[in-house]
Regions:
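Conserved pre-ATP/AMP-binding loop-to-beta segment of ANL
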Residues: 44-47, 163, 168-169, 183-209, ...
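Conserved AMP-binding/adenylate-forming core of the ANL superfamily
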Residues: 45, 49-103, 120-125, 176, ...
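Conserved AMP-binding A3 loop
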Residues: 59-64, 198, 205-229
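Structural core segment of the AMP-binding/adenylate-forming
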Residues: 103, 107-178, 501
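AMP-binding/adenylate-forming catalytic core of the ANL superfamily
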Residues: 119, 125-126, 136-141, 297, ...
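Conserved AMP-binding/adenylation subdomain of ANL enzymes
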Residues: 228-248, 252-295, 310
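Gly/Ser/Thr-rich phosphate-binding loop
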Residues: 267, 294-298, 308-368, 380, ...
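Conserved ATP/PPi-binding loop(s) of AMP-dependent carboxylate-activating enzymes
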Residues: 388-423, 461
Length: 557
């Protein structure tokens, strides 16, 4: 399949990839028609989705199954009056219905807004009114339905609330199993009419409210070409093939889900493995990977921090050939420990809700622990300091040059917010707001957000380097480094630390904070060592699992 969308589909080296990578973008590209329906026609019996849950239930769907289900859902939604450009919010956890549903919405031309089940009624009101959401489709969990019902009176744009079950409250519509599996998709003329119209190209397709590490969520909107841009994510970073069974750990409300559980994987022709769990337990994930013989795996760094504390040798993970991570920087100590046990290097990557994978340790490269890898050639990536290109090992901001061309995968705008769009996208560059340094081999290393850099006694200190040093101590499970006001230094370094299991008693031992400070001094320059250490039970995080340093800073203010 990928040969239809690339001028050259195979590359012998990273240099070959950098020099010859180029997309072939069909006019009015629509992932639903140009990829999914095409697979259904060419290889109808090929496995597309393998879903299982905590109860041991299992579902296996082929590409022909997904086409049939999506057409049935098209028929169901069109009958309700849902049409092109309607905003449809989907709160579906990891339920299998998410996959045919998003394909159906792409066929209709509606804008999909995936959302996490962790939203409160206040969050739902904000989203519905900011985006004029017309329909909410949710899994029938009582807590989710309750929050939606509490929000509903304050959301005048919402016309339909649809539950996929098991709970269907009064005033809601039900999208039943029979609607999905045995609906009218094969005979409904609306389905064939939409196929003839074939929405796509630069029409709006999907929008995310960014979880954000500060401020109210932004509305990041992408067109239909965004799906195609994830081909590189799957084929050359996740390294999936048509024979792969790929697992990405992500709720469907996060942007990570379409990075690793949908677009690129299905363009390549891999099967997507979904473990629909209610409570995250590292041992359960490992058992599922062993049972189903998962071949490639991607998870945020937090998951790896938990995995390396398990007895990984108890599990037969010999099927696992390739592992990746993104979402935030991974501490080298975690990467090294995973390699020592599994003999697999974790291939890191970097991107944002606004982009696809912009930097990655691609499959031809040697992984360097702590490095995000090199620029994806579909983006013109630069590292800038005060308007000039950064030198090797100099910290600069990661920017995407857009003066000559706008790369496939870059967002269209912050929806309904041109001022904010212009703040980050001006003078021919999109500014990510993320800082990094580049070594002499061209590998990038994450430093932090522009706002996270600590300025202490004339030094500029990146929080991630201090966090890396702390994470090499066996007592530290997680940590966040921030600045606090200091009369002499301007700012001082503070570390907020979560202790690992078995070390919790140390939080009440006064000398232990001093031990951690001395440990950091042994690992890096002494001026970077935290002057203040606070022990907590957990760190504040965004709904996608990123540490909210801004919340820690606000407590100090």
């Amino acid at each position: 399949m990928i040969e239809h969308f690339l001028k050259q589909a195979e590359f012998s080296s990273m240099e070959d990839f950098e020099q010859h990578f180029e997309f072939v973008v069909p006019e009015k590209f629509n992932f639903a028609y140009d990829v999914m329906d095409r697979w259904a026609a060419e290889q109808p019996d090929k496995l597309a989705l393998l879903w299982t849950n905590d109860k041991g239930e299992e579902r296996r769907y082929t590409f022909a199954d997904i086409k049939r289900q999506s057409d049935n859902i098209v028929s169901y939604l069109v009958a309700l009056g849902i049409k092109k450009d309607d905003m449809v919010m989907c709160i579906l956890k990891r339920r299998y219905q998410f996959w045919p549903l998003i394909i159906a919405l792409h066929k209709i031309g509606a804008v999909v807004i995936p959302a996490t089940y962790l939203l409160t009624d206040k969050d739902i009101v904000y989203r519905c009114n900011e985006a004029d959401i017309k329909t909410i489709i949710a899994c029938g969990d009582k807590d989710i339905l309750r929050h939606i019902d509490l929000a509903y009176p304050s959301c005048p744009s919402v016309e339909h609330r649809i539950s996929i079950g098991p709970e269907v409250p009064e005033g809601w519509l039900a999208m039943t199993e029979d609607d999905v599996q045995n609906g009218n998709g094969a005979t409904d003329p609306a389905v064939s009419q939409l196929r003839e119209i074939h929405y796509g190209g630069h029409d709006h397709m999907i929008m995310y409210f960014t979880s954000g590490t500060s401020g109210e969520p932004k509305m990041v909107i992408h067109d239909y070409t965004y799906a195609l841009a994830h081909l590189t994510t799957a084929a050359f970073w996740h390294n999936v093939t048509p024979e792969s069974l790929h697992l990405t750990v992500s709720d469907t409300g996060w942007g990570k889900a379409v990075w690793g559980k949908l677009y690129g994987q299905w363009i390549v022709g891999a099967a997507v493995f979904v473990y629909d769990h209610e409570i995250f337990r590292p041992t359960d994930i490992l058992k599922k990977m062993e049972q189903y013989k998962v071949t490639s795996f991607c998870a945020p760094p937090t998951i790896y921090r938990y995995l390396v504390r398990e007895d990984l040798k108890r599990y037969d993970l010999s099927s696992l050939k390739y592992v990746t991570t993104a979402g935030e920087a991974l501490n080298p100590s975690v990467s090294d420990k995973f390699y020592d046990i599994m003999h697999l290097r974790i291939y890191e990557g970097f991107g944002q809700t606004e982009t696809t994978c912009t930097l990655g340790t691609f499959k031809w490269m040697k992984a360097k622990p702590g490095s995000m890898g090199k620029p994806n050639p579909q983006y013109d990536i630069h590292l800038m300091v005060d308007g000039r290109e950064a030198k090797d090992d100099e910290v600069g901001e990661i920017v995407v040059r857009t003066a000559e061309r706008i790369p496939l995968g870059l967002f269209n705008e912050y929806y309904r917010n041109p001022e904010l769009t212009n703040e980050v996208w001006h003078d021919g560059y999109y500014h990510t707001g993320d800082l990094a340094r580049r070594d002499s081999d061209g590998y990038f290393y994450y430093v932090g957000r522009v706002d996270d850099v600590i300025k202490s006694a004339g030094y500029r200190i990146g929080p991630f380097e201090v966090e890396n040093a702390l994470m090499t101590h066996p007592a530290v499970l997680e940590c966040a480094v921030t600045a606090v006001p200091d009369e002499q230094r301007g700012q001082a370094v503070k570390a907020t630390v979560v202790l690992a299991k078995g070390w919790e008693y140390k939080k009440n031992v006064h000398s232990f904070a001093h031990e951690l400070k001395e440990h950091v001094k042994r690992m890096t320059a002494s001026y970077k060592a935290p002057r203040i250490i606070e022990f907590v039970d957990e760190l504040p995080k965004t709904i996608s699992g990123k540490i909210r340093r801004v919340e820690i800073r606000e407590k100090e203010d």
